[in-house]
Swiss-Prot record:
Assembly and oligomerization: Component of the RNA polymerase III (Pol III) complex consisting of 17 subunits.
SUPFAM superfamilies in the cross-refs: beta and beta-prime subunits of DNA dependent RNA-polymerase
Subcellular location: Nucleus
GO biological process: one example: termination of RNA polymerase III transcription
The protein, known as: DNA-directed RNA polymerase III subunit RPC2
Keyword Magnesium: no
Region Disordered, residue ranges: 1-21
E.C. numbers: 2.7.7.6
Domain of life: Eukaryota
Molecular function as annotated in GO: DNA binding; DNA-directed RNA polymerase activity; ribonucleoside binding; zinc ion binding
Protein purpose: DNA-dependent RNA polymerase catalyzes the transcription of DNA into RNA using the four ribonucleoside triphosphates as substrates. Second largest core component of RNA polymerase III which synthesizes small RNAs, such as 5S rRNA and tRNAs. Proposed to contribute to the polymerase catalytic activity and forms the polymerase active center together with the largest subunit. Pol III is composed of mobile elements and RPC2 is part of the core element with the central large cleft and probably a clamp element that moves to open and close the cleft.
UniProt source species: Schizosaccharomyces pombe (strain 972 / ATCC 24843)
Amino acid sequence: MGVNTAGDPQKSQPKINKGGIGKDESFGALFKPVYKGKKLADPVPTIEDKWQLLPAFLKVKGLVKQHLDSYNYFVDVDLKKIVQANEKVTSDVEPWFYLKYLDIRVGAPVRTDADAIQASISPHECRLRDLTYGANIYVDIEYTRGKQVVRRRNVPIGRMPVMLRSNKCVLSGKNEMEMAALNECPLDPGGYFIVKGTEKVILVQEQLSKNRIIVEAEPKKGLWQASVTSSTHERKSKTYVITKNGKLYLKHNSVADDIPIVVVLKAMGLQSDQEIFELVAGAEASYQDLFAPSIEECAKLNIYTAQQALEYIGARVKVNRRAGANRLPPHEEALEVLAAVVLAHINVFNLEFRPKAVYIGIMARRVLMAMVDPLQVDDRDYVGNKRLELAGQLLALLFEDLFKKFNSDLKLNIDKVLKKPHRTQEFDAYNQLTVHSDHITQGMVRALSTGNWSLKRFKMERAGVTHVLSRLSYISALGMMTRITSQFEKTRKVSGPRSLQASQFGMLCTSDTPEGEACGLVKNLALMTHITTDEEEEPIIKLAYAFGIEDIHVISGRELHSHGTYLVYLNGAILGISRYPSLFVASFRKLRRSGKISPFIGIFINTHQRAVFISTDGGRICRPLIIVQNGLPKVESKHIRLLKEGKWGFEDFLKQGLVEYVDVNEENDSLISVYERDITPDTTHLEIEPFTILGAVAGLIPYPHHNQSPRNTYQCAMGKQAIGAIAYNQLQRIDTLLYLMVYPQQPMVKTKTIELIGYDKLPAGQNATVAIMSYSGYDIEDALVLNKSSIDRGFGRCQVFHKHSVIVRKYPNGTHDRIGDPQRDPETGEVVWKHGVVEDDGLAGVGCRVQPGQIYVNKQTPTNALDNSITLGHTQTVESGYKATPMTYKAPEPGYIDKVMLTTTDSDQTLIKVLMRQTRRPELGDKFSSRHGQKGVCGVIVQQEDMPFNDQGICPDIIMNPHGFPSRMTVGKMIELLSGKVGVLRGTLEYGTCFGGTKVEDASRILVEHGYNYSGKDMLTSGITGETLEAYIFMGPIYYQKLKHMVMDKMHARARGPRAVLTRQPTEGRSRDGGLRLGEMERDCLIAYGASQLLLERLMISSDACDVDVCGQCGLLGYKGWCNSCQSTREVVKMTIPYAAKLLFQELLSMNIVPRLALEDEFKY
């Protein structure tokens, strides 16, 4: 290649065009696009450049942005829609009265303190003071007062919890310096709420999509059904078309029986059988045969006209009107149900039933198609049939419910006032508004803090919608923001919803799911996914008609099913038919790529059903892809250069039509290639980066494509438990439980994901030099051997912070708690040991060492705090009037006081929070893990002198047993060791990104250049004997995480101790100093051994032996040698039984069951 060929005429290229025809340049130009990018010399846009799109994407979308977008949409758009739908409050008593809402908005977060000087409040202050981070909801109203119409602006009607980092939050748009001034961490993801001082996340909820036909089948049982869940603002209901005995029926909750489908269609105005037959069955003989019995059935019922059909249906309608109201005639009832309740998402104007009739016909046809062809059955678990509900949608449902209740309460109260005939002052409705403003606030706070969404209108009862944001590490908080939960019962052991679907590729993370019962039901979003919000439908409908759709009102059944016509759906409702579907779809996409319509609108062709689906609804998962045209990606190096220079953002790539968002259904309509080299002339899209099929948590693993799949899943769970740093403001926070690693390091082997999510700024782990060899017997079963000198130098050292809070209460009778002075010894005047750390203000000093059992807040409560007799003045000076209720330090090891904070809560009580600190070094039994799901406990800590060392004197920090590798097949760990070693020698951080990263050949080559063995093995010398070890040892740096499971928090044993009051058995649990239970299974083992005396000793003598008097005659329990039922002392004997058994007998007696003890002599002979 490098030879200069210009001078030599033989070697110079013949100047013939690629067409091979003479010198005609213009003719050759025709052929140029075909070869562009296909020659070897032309540079293909390299992977290096392309991934720059990722940080640009994560700036505008992704990870936590979906929560923020959803909340912003709710606050800016949905709130106004909800208020417009319920804008007027009228009175039943006075016809002239009305109250109308003109506008609604949410203000900025403010304090609720009465004496606040500065109104705005920061989230950090809410966390510390246990407040709710919320903003006022203001409305503009217009109402009548006497003879005039009054307008008022900015009337507060309640408080809305504010999501952090949303556009209503104090933090939105702030730079790092301003964040620091607010004590907030710039890397904190936001997207959660602060309710009563705890951070609450509304998890993404997964549900089946609304307003779409879903066909299910169980051919073995002879069941086929098409169902639609219609959801509108007013109601939510489910409509089925089912088969029974080969006939089709419509099933709905508001109708008592299943109604034959033909009767329904007749009631909707399709009176001719011919018309119905064409609409449902079309011209295909197989469908006609299946549909014929349904037509016959209608004739058997003697229903021929719409009126007869309506009366048939009307007789079966369930009416839920109030008892007093008179019933409509049956056919009007039926019309109302058909118009408004059945398939509620299809509107009926002026009793024009045609669209709804066609829809039911199509549903019936889909059932027939499924009966003929099993391919037509839908998959419930397919991601395209799912919708994800975000915080905004859930809050909108909640707010709508609360707002409706608020209005109905307001109306009742106004009616109550207006009923009084002799009113002295003029009636002002404004006063009523302010009275009720608590409803909305309380409802919002209750739902967020308990996680129970109970809405009366939709009969929606959901538990566990919100969770406390887990702050174990930065990754655990981030992983929680991308988590998706499905409302599926965890107990059922079905594999369908749990298995990995092919349609989840690139949308949901393939590794990150918990083990155990929630496996596969709790999922996580992949790195580049975005969840759509609702778009306006009107412009899309106009556009569709402009592209030549024929309206559904004017089309006969025959035309509908004629060859080459495709139905066009918009969000599940039928718009019309198109005879040129591919052209229609292509022109739609052209408009989307040129930025004329929203980039999140999806459109795709389904050839099975002969339909085109357009979707603009919220909750679809989509991801960006590079558009490919004529076998060439549209993104070129010059565009990436603009991006690097900061002249372009991600939005520009969308507007220029280089990148587009594709949802799951549209992916089915595309051919996506992963690398440039795979592009063929048919390719439509190119992946931006293949490693984005993993999520944020799985992206931390180096070389995950070399590991066995479940190992990556284990690491996803353990990466969230690794102790590191939580945030930059960690030392300002006072949380219930905080962990901090003393010397965190960023990993030697990084991945692209680590940089994108900022893990390298808040890492959780340390690079340990690991030797893989057997050493002593203490490394069996994954145990690790640790080097004592490494621990002395700070390896694996962490700090644990515990919060203890106490409220100094004020009581209704005028008394209040107080903080007392430390108690002194009466003789010497010294402070007693128990109060050793308490200073003169009754609180422990910061930095004091607290021993177990010492007091650190000397609180005292008045003895008469709970009686409600009002004490005259504060006459409580008597010392005896207080009893001590101090805060005592209960942990087993001494700790240090890190912080003491005094503040007031919003109800004006004084709140004291004390933060305790313990510094812990690794000890036997602490749990560590590498980033490959290889967890192990510390088995032994060895002096450095006894550890093996290499010729440079390097000693390993950890020795790991090689038996952990063969069965687990974590080759990624070995490659990490190799890459890490290279990084140390070169002074660089190597990459171990999924499907990429430093290659083993390159790494080995660099090792050899630096004078090491190419396979990463070293010659070690035994520290015990001083001889060279017989084998070469694989040694190098691996990133190890210390997990939160530490022996000090778990170790527990007891001999004697407290007992439960009721059963007199030892209590349960470590916190109550409980006993260790010998359970049923252990009992069975002892029975099998025949160790009867041991059983007696464990289950009775050491547990709860009890001497009772038993009457030998009647077999009941007596008392002090007297049997109460026989009224004698004759045959009463003493015996020992467990107290729990005695309790059981007495409880049975109380339930009128008489257990009698049949006694035998122990020694008969």
